[in-house]
Structure formats: structure tokens, C-alpha cells
Amino acid sequence: MDWEKLGLKMGLEIHQQLNTKHKLFCPCKTELVDEDYNEIVERNLRPTQSELGEIDRAALQESLRGLNFKYESYDHHTCLVESDDEPPHSLNKEALEICITIAALMNMHIVDEFHTMRKQVIDGSNTGGFQRTGLAATDGYLDTPYGRVAIESLGLEEDAARRIETTEDYTEFRLDRLGIPLAEITTDPSMHHPDQVREVAYMIGQVLRSTNVKRGLGTIRQDLNISIEKGARVEIKGVQNLDLMSEIVENEVQRQLALIEIKEELNKRNAEVLEEIHDLDSLFENTKSKILSSAESIKAVVLKGFNGLIGKEVQPGRRFGTEIASYAKKRGVSGIFHSDELPAYGITQDEVNSVKDYLNVGSQDAFIIVAHDENVAISALEEVKRRANLGFEGVVEETRKSLDDGNTEYMRPLPTANRMYLETDIPLFKITDELVEPIKNNLPELPDVKKERIIKEYNLSEDLASQLVKRLEADVFEEILTDVEVDPTPVASLLAYDLREIKREGLDIDILTTRHLKDIFQLLADSKIAKDSVTKLTTCVIQSPDEEIEITAKNNNLTLLSHEEVTQIIEDIVNKNEAMVKERQMGAMGPLMGMSMKELKGKADGSIVNRIVKESIQKML
């Protein structure tokens, strides 16, 4: 595709959980829980007017669903602030300091005062119907291989509650995540190539990972804003996989182009969405379709001039009918039937013909059927009509959900500025030079820069250095080597790989202190243990953390034998296998090495064993 000709514009919104000791406006812990809740809180939410007296369209759309909300609460991880039964406490200064660090790394202007606002969110993910948020910095930039990208804003806000279960009557959330500090980074829409947006997301991720942020699945959420010249701005939520970003962009552009084609064809045909909702119960009294026969009510609407367009592909494996169905599903139905895909689902051609006759459907017309309880079916068809009418506009502004296959699905209308109003329970926070300057003077090293430096300074492989940085072990690695003169590679291997294996065996690696690790590697530096014994000794230290490290090594037979003792053991093994040595000559090296290592049981360094075995064979020959 010619992205420039299409007028492709993209921007990013990245939400990153901060690794603070407590939540943004209360003292509760910021860890997630997977255990039985202590209490259930129930709420019903409705939209309120902004300061200008207007109601946000996304909030209004959610309220029309009429859902009840249940919230699971926990001791130590939730309190009355999360359930909106107590005013918020003071702003978490630690979270603000992390945001200032992020802002400085992205060349941003840090605001003088942090004002907390309320942003309406009535999908149930916030018990009060709003999210607390504030602006921390503006007007920054990052220099990328594609040129400079502007960073419009950096916000600090509360994370939302976790969705646990959704039924026809209610949605259940868990309050452990609600209130965890979240940094929101927004770029301007100046990116014009799918690969560029992936590169910028990666670079922002590098900035975030150099600061005190949470790591792991669900701790970072990336949203894409995409538009083309004849289309409209669409926000795609929850892009987790950077490798999928380019494909998501391409599929969204394909969708917008297809919707523009549908618009042009609808106008050419003088198409029309008829208002009447028809009852088809009598036509399907004897149907073999399991879905229709089990439904309380079967309703339909006629879309004049839509024939062939509902089945038109808008994304790989998704059609215009899928777009319409996504709107209908918001009213509680599992899907729709449209004439472009029938007969199917147990509906016969004769039944299709009888529907066409009953509805007086012409050759260019289409119809859509919904089967459910009567009120739900009518409500869903109202949404069908609304989405079909939006087809005359081409692309409409909306928020969509990222799917694992690179496609997207409708979530809700695009929010407007009408959902923001001032939080009166929290005073402003003055951001002074005394707070900012020490942070600016001690900025962290970016991960890629740190990795390259570690490779150069310690002669590590790129893989080992990458793992150290990725697993946040680089600082511990350097601290050990500052105090202990030892080969860097076994230190890096233990931190990057072996500790993970020890953890998989069920041992608590958090027991290990940096002091423990330094003492282990001091034994290695003093030639008191072999490199091969480092992992085993680490396991023993976890099991006896209060014992002196050298005593632990001796008690577990991990201390090295003297050179003379090692030589004697190896020569005995070689002499016992003289016939094999005479027959294979240096080819006996492998088997004899294996026998020697088995006999020595880690009490000698492998490289030394290798040398002595080789010398013993040569002496015999």
C-alpha cells in the first residue's frame, strides 16, 4: 500500500503500571491477588454531565446496556477508597517521581502543578463511575530512525479494576488492580508507516523499563490511534504484541478502505435502512434451526440496497456483517443472521425465500434476523439499524479492541472531552525545582545503552547481556563484580538463567541477598569451588541461608580437591582404561572425561579436568 497517498496517520497511547509501594490514593498494596475475596460490593452506574453540561457519548452508550456491577474486595489489597466509600488519600509522591523521571528521559516539559481530574468511565471498571487522572508533563520528543516523534503528554492515573466475569445480568470485577498508579504516554499522530509505530512503541518501552515500573503480562497496555485521509480516527485498545502492530495497522487500513467502498456503493444504490422491526415467529414455527427454535422471539429488519455488501470482507475473515454484529452484541445477543450468509445455521433456502416474500425484499435488498428474548431482540435490532445507517458515513470514530489475529472488534464510540471534570477531594500538588532537579541529575541508563556497555566492558555475549537487562539483574551483576574479581560469565549465567531454573524447582530465590551471591562468587574467585558447582551451592544456600557460605559448600561436598588429588584420581581412571586408550588414542578423551567428572562430582573445575585427562592420555601413548 502507498501509505503516504492514503494519508495514513498514527499515534500511540501507552499505559504502564508503576512499581510503587502502595496505590495512587490509598495505602493498599499494588500486587494482584488470586484467592477467595472477603466481600462483594454492588453498584449501578450512570453518566453525569461535564463542567460544560454535556454527556460523553461513550459513557452514555455504556449506560444503555443497563448492567449491574459486582466487585470483589480483599483485606490489605483493597479498602474503602476502592469501593468509593471513603475520600481518596494524598497523592502518591513516589508515583509522581517516577513520572518525572519518564518525562525527563523523553525531553518533556514538567508541569508546575499536578491537578487531579475525574474522567467518566461507566463500563464498571471503576466503582465511582470515574477514573482519577492528572497531567504530569507535555511537549516532549523521541528521536527515532524514522525521524523525531512528538510526545504530547504524560499523565498519571489510576488503573482500573480487573474484569472477572460477564453474564447477561451483571459484570464482576476484582478491586485489587483498581488504584495501582499508571503512567499514560501519548504521542502526536505524526507516524505514517506501520513499521514506524512499532519502532516508537519499542523505544517508549525502553524508556519505561529503565525506570521503576512493573513487569510482566498485563502491566503495560498499548493503544493505537489510526486514520486515513477519507476515513476517521479509530482507537485500537490493548495491543500487547509489538510484532503484531504492523499487521494491525494494515488490517485497520484495509477495513477503512472497505467501509469507504461500501459507503460509495450504498449512496450509488440510494440505499435505505427501514425503521420497522418485523416479527418472524410464525415463519419459523417448524424450523430445524436449533438457534431459532430455542429463541423466545425472532425479529428482523430490512436494509434496502444492502444486498452483497453485508457479506463484503472488511478485514481478513471478517465482514461488514461482523461489524454490525459487534454493535448488536452490546445489547446482549450472541450474534445476528444476515441474508448474505443464508441459507446456513440450519436455516433452509425455503425459509430464506419465505422471509424475503414476507418482508417484500427486492434483489438488491438485504435483511438481518435476531433471535432472543423479545426486548433484547428489539434492542439489538435498534443497534443493527444504527450501525447500518453509519454505513452511509463510511468510517466512524470508535474505540476497537485488538484481537490476537491482527484484526480488531468494536467496543464503544470514541470518547469525547465531555467526560472530564475536576476532582474536588484532592488538593493540587506543587512540583518544585527541589523535587525535579535531583531526579534530572540522576537519570537511569536506557536498557539498550546498558546492554551495549555491559557487552563491551565485561566481554559477555549479546544473549547473556540482553537477559541480564531484561530480567533487571544488570545492577546486581555489576555490584558483584565491583567487589569480587571473578570471571563475569558464570555470574551472568547464574543471574540470567540458573536462578530461573532454581525457581522452577520450587525454591524461593527471593531469600538470596546480594551478600550471599558475592560470597558464593568469592569462593569461585579463590578457587575453592568449581564453576560447575555454583548453581548447586546457590540451591544449598537458599535452603540454609543463615549458614556461612564456605561451611555450606563443605557440608555439601562442593569444595574443590587439591591439584594433586585431582591428578591422582584421573590417572587412576586412565590406567584402568589402558586398553581403550591404546585402541582409540586421543579418541578416548570423551569417555575418560565423562568418567572423571562423574568420579570427581564437581570437586574440580571442568577445564582443569580436561587438561589433566589430555596430559594423562598423552603420557600413556
From Swiss-Prot:
Keyword ATP-binding annotated: yes
GO cellular component entries: cytoplasm
Family annotation (Pfam families): GAD, GatB_N, GatB_Yqey
GO molecular function terms listed in the Swiss-Prot or TrEMBL record: aminoacyl-tRNA ligase activity; ATP binding; glutaminyl-tRNA synthase (glutamine-hydrolyzing) activity
GO biological process, one term: translation
Coiled coil regions in record: none
EC number: 6.3.5.-
Catalytic activities: L-glutamyl-tRNA(Gln) + L-glutamine + ATP + H2O = L-glutaminyl-tRNA(Gln) + L-glutamate + ADP + phosphate + H(+)
EC top class, as a word: ligase
Endoplasmic reticulum is among the record's keywords: no
Record keywords, A-Z: ATP-binding, Ligase, Nucleotide-binding, Protein biosynthesis
PANTHER family, alphabetized: GLUTAMYL-TRNA GLN AMIDOTRANSFERASE SUBUNIT B MITOCHONDRIAL AND PROKARYOTIC PET112-RELATED, GLUTAMYL-TRNA(GLN) AMIDOTRANSFERASE SUBUNIT E
Its job: Allows the formation of correctly charged Gln-tRNA(Gln) through the transamidation of misacylated Glu-tRNA(Gln) in organisms which lack glutaminyl-tRNA synthetase. The reaction takes place in the presence of glutamine and ATP through an activated gamma-phospho-Glu-tRNA(Gln). The GatDE system is specific for glutamate and does not act on aspartate.
HAMAP family linked: GatE
Family stated for the protein in its record: Belongs to the GatB/GatE family. GatE subfamily.
UniProt-listed NCBIfam families: gatE_arch, PRK04028.1
Protein name in UniProt: Glutamyl-tRNA(Gln) amidotransferase subunit E
Organism the protein comes from: Methanobrevibacter smithii (strain ATCC 35061 / DSM 861 / OCM 144 / PS)
Designated gene of the protein: gatE
